[in-house]
């Protein structure tokens, strides 16, 4: 199959593209740095010519909720319109477990909800894949607020998944038929985000004092079980400990 991956130079998109290629598929990498701009549509029609499926694993720059909504809205509309022109038969969207159950969350969550809405209402057959936070999310979250060796971070309850594991799931789904809303995809164990950040920073040699708080980018709308997968979730194999032992990559 010919499968395009949007966000192919990113953390999950790059891994997904590699797994698809390892599976024998013809992969088209879509990224602004590779000459395809989802915001303007430049290069998009040429990139999707002959494509059977598209995986959307793009992320957004760290901006306001309004700007993130505009970014995800524009890029998703452009991508879906180009897919329809090209006759693409399957749009696979990487999303986030729990975002439909909350009104708040980060700016990124606001944008992902808009992506889901556009995909569900669009003309291209689709699969939305809700995943839990990735194993590297805790280290990233602590870096958002770090100042002079001190970082605030919310004590979220999460069930994180290894980046390689979710990329393999996306590659598998992209090679098959559209499935609508897929089951939640998660790692095997629940974790506390503060402890994850502490252990990640230790492995990476970072000296950061962590201060647990809900007064930050991750707020009380994300507390409790809201970010945990449903009972029928697909559970990926790699534990957080195994990911750390492999060098936190």
PLM regions: where:
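A conserved pocket-lining segment of Rossmann-fold NAD(P)-dependent short-chain dehydrogenase/reductase
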Residues: 126-127, 140-161
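Non-catalytic, hydrophobic alpha-helical segments
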Residues: 12, 54, 166-170, 185, ...
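Glycine-rich Rossmann NAD(P)(H)-binding loop
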Residues: 153-157, 183-190
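N-terminal Rossmann NAD(P)H-binding glycine-rich loop of SDR-like oxidoreductase domains
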Residues: 1-25
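Mobile cap/lid helix-loop segments that border enzyme active or cofactor-binding sites
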Residues: 195-249
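Glycine/proline-rich active-site loop of Rossmann-fold NAD(P)-dependent oxidoreductases
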Residues: 136-142, 147, 173-183, 206
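NAD(P)H-binding glycine-rich loop region in Rossmannoid oxidoreductase-like domains
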Residues: 22-86, 97-107
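Conserved beta-loop-beta element that borders a ligand/cofactor-binding pocket
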Residues: 87-90, 95-98, 114-137, 144
């Amino acid at each position: 199959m010919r499968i395009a991956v949007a966000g192919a130079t990113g953390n999950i998109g790059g891994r997904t593209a590699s797994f698809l290629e390892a599976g024998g598929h013809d992969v088209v990498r879509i990224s602004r740095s590779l000459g395809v701009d989802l915001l303007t549509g430049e290069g998009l029609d040429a990139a999707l010519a002959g494509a059977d499926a598209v995986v959307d694993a793009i992320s957004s720059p760290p901006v306001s909720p309004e700007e993130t909504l505009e970014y995800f809205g524009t890029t998703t509309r452009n991508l879906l319109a180009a897919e329809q022109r090209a006759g693409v038969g399957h749009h696979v969207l990487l999303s986030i477990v729990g975002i439909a159950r909350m009104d708040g969350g980060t700016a990124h969550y606001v944008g992902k909800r808009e992506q889901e809405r556009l995909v569900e209402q669009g003309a291209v057959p689709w699969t939305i894949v809700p995943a839990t936070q990735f194993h590297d999310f805790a280290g990233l979250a602590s870096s958002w607020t770090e100042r002079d060796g001190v970082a605030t971070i919310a004590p979220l309850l999460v069930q994180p998944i290894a980046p390689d594991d979710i990329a393999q799931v996306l590659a598998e789904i992209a090679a098959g038929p559209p499935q609508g809303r897929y089951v939640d995809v998660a790692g095997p164990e629940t974790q506390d985000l503060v402890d994850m950040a502490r252990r990640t920073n230790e492995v990476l040699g970072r000296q950061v004092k962590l201060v647990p708080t809900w007064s930050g980018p991750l707020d009380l709308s994300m507390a409790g079980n809201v970010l945990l997968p449903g009972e029928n979730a697909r559970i990926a194999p790699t534990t957080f400990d195994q990911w750390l032992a492999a060098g936190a990559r």
